[in-house]
């Protein structure tokens, strides 16, 4: 018996800080500190308590907590670096500079707001039109006052940048490069102060050539965008209260031009309609490592205040898995710390060209005191060593020697064992998907160079007498994927129920309810959560199917900080009031009725979370988010975002985890496992797939080979699904080889459901089907994309028309609604819900 919960208004009527807020801030602070990466330290850090500090940079008092757009969070307050350093007992000698900058900042913010309001007022659509103006008009920080010399012992400079949804960054001053004002500030700081520390507070990578100019920059930290506890977490690292343990999840090139797609990415070549993935597999470290291009800071790199030594105790082949047992000891004498053990593999060259090394496993120790050690067991499943053969339509292991490396970064890793395979073997037989419709010439290595590098590597393994594990192809079982149509991938009980619903209700359920969340009467509508992204239709409420609420992420729940209830209804507020912490509603008259407060936790952005390399911590954060979802009646969190960092100028990289699919998949799985510990709550992994460009994101076509698509851009989603079974997937706006991702049966049904065993629901990104006739609601249903969001009457018209003319089958529509119903039944809108992962 399923009992729908009694409905209620979310939030509290008391504006006092709650126990939940205080406890969750602690988790956010811990995560922020653990994800910050110490890139350089010439003995200056940590600083002693009470050290006099000259603090400069726009991020000093206006620290960027996160990106803009759907990834923003309306928290109660954010702790700036200035506040955090004062809280930690440091003396700030540049109070006047900071006060002057704050005044300039406020004036610039209001001018920016007015510019957006004025431009948006000219447009007919005041919702999507406003957001388009907002997302393509980035806020530019004002310049601070001239630097002056104080009696500080150390100067700290905070380099900050804002990025967000809807627009890519530029390789120009004020974005990837320093402005002339910033160069002058940094030059003055380095001339006036003997000891200088720089922190990079940006959503993506930035040019660091200034590090080559100033020898007295003695420490460099990558703090990304650390969430609401930014300042306290920064002070924890600077003071030594927390020892840095973050590691890079990207490769920081010496110069932007070193990235293989730097000339053609997004607007760089003037073409935002088609994005040719000519670098193929060679994304991030796979390129730099394979082509021997030096980097400034490499993948997996990060310093500590202490030192570690990791020994490989054993490497064995067990049940067709490589099992590596390691022991890590803190060899320092002062600071406790954590270390990340990373395993890489070099795969043999056969018919398929391969990257020189790929990440295949990682784990992080607990906090180790000086002299303390910890043993860990890492496993490498055979699928982590496979490559995709388009010719065979299969994941294959090619004959030869697979060299396993261990280290605490890619650069520091060294060979530790070899797996010898006696013959080629197919691990998984699939069908081809997403075929190219035009020629694509991918980057290739010199075959002679490959042969030389591999020969030298194998010679080294023989000279060192590294252990060799023998694997016979005959002992490897081949899995042959069974493919089913969209209409066949259906939960039986839900399908029986759906057969009882009218066509009118089926069509209504196929898209979100456009009226929810604004002025809804709780007596006649579903639960409405102001600031949430949307709600599914509750047209079948009398049949036992309530609407469920979906809230944006991925840096926490994005809701309105407060709203009013008047005469039993939520007072309607424009969408823009949920942006920028309420900047666009300042000066508006007070609303009538009772005020309710819903403060959510702003956790660090995705990149910083991934830089922790700590799946246990990420799972803890996920469970924390799930608790807030329950408190605010949210079933689906529209997160985590897990697209690949293909180029550092992608405007949305801050939301995403890494240039590496294993990191992206593992972190997303951990976040999902945490959220879904909370009964009836689930994640929505996104954006599926190849959403690596924000300019023209609604119409950009990603031209990519099937092998690259599978090994780089789909692999993270595959890992997340097989290791955590998220409730939902969100498709992306872009096309993949000429087919809109939202209308792509190859990815939605063949890959996600048939190959990876996805059991949940798939939804579109917002307004995907409202951009033209080549992406339709009916196309979504045929592809196995179950829910069109946020919902428009034009979607219903399209579905009804195609049901009548037979273009859309009733079986396809019912299959999609069955999967939606199956998720709603397991949601927190029912009494006695259980964690989703426990539902068979």
Where are these regions (language model features)?
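Glycoside hydrolase catalytic-domain context in secreted enzymes
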Residues: 1-387, 396-412, 430-840
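Extracellular/periplasmic metallocenter environments
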Residues: 393
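Short beta-strand elements
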Residues: 412-429
């Amino acid at each position: 018996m399923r009992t729908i919960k009694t409905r209620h208004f979310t939030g509290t009527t008391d504006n006092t800080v709650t126990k939940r807020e205080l406890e969750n801030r602690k988790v956010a602070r811990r995560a922020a500190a653990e994800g910050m990466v110490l890139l350089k330290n010439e003995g200056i850090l940590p600083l002693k308590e009470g050290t006099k500090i000259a603090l400069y940079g726009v991020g000093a008092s206006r620290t960027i907590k996160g990106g803009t757009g759907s990834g923003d969070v309306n928290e109660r307050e954010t702790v700036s670096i200035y506040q955090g350093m004062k809280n930690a007992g440091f003396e700030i000698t540049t109070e006047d500079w900071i006060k002057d900058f704050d005044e300039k900042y406020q004036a610039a913010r209001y001018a920016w707001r007015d510019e957006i309001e004025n431009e948006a007022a000219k447009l007919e659509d005041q919702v999507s039109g406003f957001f388009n103006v907002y997302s393509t008009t980035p806020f530019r920080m004002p310049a601070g006052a001239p630097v002056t010399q104080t009696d500080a012992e150390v100067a700290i400079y905070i380099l900050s940048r804002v990025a967000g949804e809807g627009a890519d960054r530029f390789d120009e001053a004020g974005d990837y490069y320093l402005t002339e004002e910033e160069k002058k500030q940094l030059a003055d700081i380095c001339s006036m102060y003997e000891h200088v520390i720089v922190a990079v507070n940006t959503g993506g990578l930035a040019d660091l050539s200034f590090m080559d100019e100033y020898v007295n920059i003695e420490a460099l930290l990558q703090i990304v965008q650390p969430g609401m506890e930014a300042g306290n977490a920064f002070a924890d690292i600077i003071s030594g209260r927390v020892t840095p343990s973050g590691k890079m999840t990207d490769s920081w090139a010496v110069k932007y031009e070193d990235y293989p797609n730097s000339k053609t990415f997004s607007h760089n070549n003037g073409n935002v309609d088609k994005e040719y993935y000519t670098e193929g597999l060679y994304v991030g470290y796979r390129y730099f490592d394979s082509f021997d291009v030096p980097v400034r800071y490499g993948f997996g790199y990060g310093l500590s205040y202490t030192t570690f030594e990791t020994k490989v105790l054993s490497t064995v082949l067990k049940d067709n898995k490589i099992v590596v047992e390691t022991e890590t000891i803190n060899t320092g004498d002062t600071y406790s710390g954590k270390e990340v053990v990373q395993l890489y593999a070099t795969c043999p060259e056969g018919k398929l060209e391969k990257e020189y090394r790929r990440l295949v496993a990682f784990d992080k120790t607990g906090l180790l005191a000086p002299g303390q050690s910890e043993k860990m067991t890492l496993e490498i499943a055979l699928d982590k060593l496979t490559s995709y053969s388009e010719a065979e339509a299969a994941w294959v292991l090619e004959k030869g020697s697979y060299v396993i490396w261990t280290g605490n970064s890619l650069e520091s890793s060294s060979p530790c064992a070899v797996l010898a395979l006696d013959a080629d073997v197919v691990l998984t037989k699939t069908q081809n998907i997403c075929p190219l419709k035009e020629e694509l010439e991918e980057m290739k290595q010199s075959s002679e160079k490959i042969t030389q590098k591999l020969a030298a590597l194998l010679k080294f393994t023989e000279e060192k007498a590294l252990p060799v594990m023998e694997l016979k192809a005959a002992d490897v079982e081949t899995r042959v994927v069974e493919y089913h149509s969209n209409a066949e991938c259906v939960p039986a009980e839900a399908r029986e129920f759906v057969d009882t619903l009218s066509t009118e209700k089926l069509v209504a359920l196929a898209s979100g309810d456009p009226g929810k969340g604004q002025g809804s009467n709780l007596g006649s509508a579903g639960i409405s959560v102001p600031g949430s992204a949307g709600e599914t239709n509750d047209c079948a409420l009398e049949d036992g199917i309530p609407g469920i609420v979906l809230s944006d992420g991925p840096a926490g729940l994005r809701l309105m900080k407060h709203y009013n209830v008047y005469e039993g209804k939520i007072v309607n507020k424009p969408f823009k009031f949920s942006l920028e912490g309420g900047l666009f509603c300042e000066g508006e008259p007070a609303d009538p009725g009772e005020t309710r407060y819903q403060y959510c936790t702003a956790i660090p952005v995705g990149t910083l979370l991934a830089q922790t390399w700590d799946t246990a911590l990420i799972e803890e954060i996920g469970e924390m988010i799930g608790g807030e979802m329950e408190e605010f009646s949210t079933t689906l969190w529209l997160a985590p975002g897990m697209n690949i960092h293909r180029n550092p100028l992608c405007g949305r990289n801050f939301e995403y985890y890494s240039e590496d699919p294993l990191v992206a998949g593992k972190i997303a799985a951990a976040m999902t496992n945490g959220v879904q510990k909370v009964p009836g709550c689930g994640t929505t992994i996104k954006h599926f797939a190849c959403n690596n460009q924000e300019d023209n994101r609604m119409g950009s076509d990603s031209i990519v080979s099937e092998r690259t698509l599978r090994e780089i851009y789909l692999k993270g989603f595959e890992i997340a699904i097989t290791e955590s079974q998220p409730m939902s997937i969100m498709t992306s706006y872009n096309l993949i080889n000429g087919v809109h991702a939202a209308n792509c049966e190859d990815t939605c049904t063949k890959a996600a459901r048939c190959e990876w065993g996805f059991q949940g629901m798939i939804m579109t990104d917002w307004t995907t089907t409202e951009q033209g006739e080549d992406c339709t609601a009916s196309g979504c249903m045929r592809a196995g994309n179950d829910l069109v969001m946020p919902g428009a009457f034009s979607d219903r018209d399209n579905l009804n028309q195609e049901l009548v003319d037979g273009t859309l089958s009733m079986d396809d529509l019912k299959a999609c609604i069955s999967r939606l119903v199956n998720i709603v039944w397991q949601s927190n809108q029912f009494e006695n819900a259980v964690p989703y992962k426990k539902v068979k």
